[in-house]
Amino acid sequence: MRYASKVNFKPELPYINRAKVVLGEHAKSSVDADAVLIRYYIPEKQQDMIKTALPKTLQDTTIFICRTTIDLGNFENDLKPHVHTNEQCVLNYYLTTNGEETSFFEGAVEPDPNIATDNGNLYYMVNTEKLQKVETFQSNTGESWLLSTRQPHQVFCKTEQHKVRDMVQIYFMDLSFDEVRKHFEVAQ
């Protein structure tokens, strides 16, 4: 795959359920709707434990770590195609999954003015008319996937059940998707 890679990353998370302080909420279908995506603060000691599970060559890079929940039942079963404008890639360690598929697109990247944008969270939805789906993967609980967040991508839940997807996310600000992937390949 060009825009996603399954990697060997399994952090110890004995206290992850304590991550309850909300850092940000976004991806609402309307102004008064519940947020689809909520990011939670992870205490520093827990973040340090997560960092030690990374390849040693990545432990001192500029990263942001949080716990994220996505409730696709609030948003027509999908998180529309979007790109991130701050970090270059993200490592998702999936705590709970429900048959969601992540798809990547190629084509002209234009903001979609009809969908709420980032609320300061540094991402925006993109117009799908000029995009073509090029690859898709399904993540499972306990897996870790590295994603190229500058490439348009979408999360779609295939099941009728609207369970919350729960994950730990590690955002890499200064390294590209390909650079981070190489660090994981060398570490194996």
Language model: regions and residue ranges:
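Solvent-exposed residues in well-ordered beta-strands and their adjoining turns
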Residues: 10, 96, 171-173
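Extracellular structured ligand-interaction cores
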Residues: 2, 78, 88-92, 99, ...
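Catalytic core of Fe(II)/2-oxoglutarate
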Residues: 118-188
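Short His-Asn-centered micro-motif
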Residues: 67-68, 82-84, 93, 147-150, ...
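Secondary-structure boundary elements
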Residues: 55-61, 96-101, 175-178
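Catalytic core of non-heme Fe(II) oxygenases with the double-stranded beta-helix
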Residues: 72-144
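A general structural signal for short secondary-structure junctions and capping/turn motifs
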Residues: 53-57, 81-85, 135-138, 157-161
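Non-heme Fe(II)/2-oxoglutarate
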Residues: 1-78
